[in-house]
Design a protein with these regions (language model features):
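C-terminal all-alpha effector/ligand-binding and dimerization domain
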Residues: 1-103
Length: 103
């Protein structure tokens, strides 16, 4: 998914799900993925997030409307259920030119 902030492409998000969640192919994914999973009785129990600095590839730069090799914040989220089974992995690339993060 390509997410916009104030009309500017700002976050490139890629979600990876196990095959058993193929029902998502028939869902409207413009809203919250967590809401869709919850509607199917699936809840996230454990979550782990990593943060790295990355440089935009040609494809990523084109989608985010920035120069190739521009710095990006790369977040990876690992979500699992109460038994530790993987639900999904999320990769988010943030265009830092449009954002300020408050911690």
């Amino acid at each position: 998914r390509l997410r916009y902030i104030d009309g500017h492409p700002s976050i490139l998000e890629t979600l990876y799900f196990p095959r058993k969640y193929d029902f998502l192919l028939h869902e409207n994914l413009e809203g919250s993925v967590f809401s869709i999973l919850h509607a199917h009785g699936i809840t996230v129990h454990n979550s782990r997030r990593t943060l790295e600095i990355s440089n935009a590839s040609s494809n990523e730069a084109g989608l985010l409307e920035i120069k190739r090799n521009s710095p990006l914040l790369l977040f990876r989220d690992y979500q699992s259920d109460s038994q530790g089974n993987p639900l999904f992995v999320c990769k988010q690339l943030y265009n830092t030119q449009n954002m300020i993060f408050y911690l």
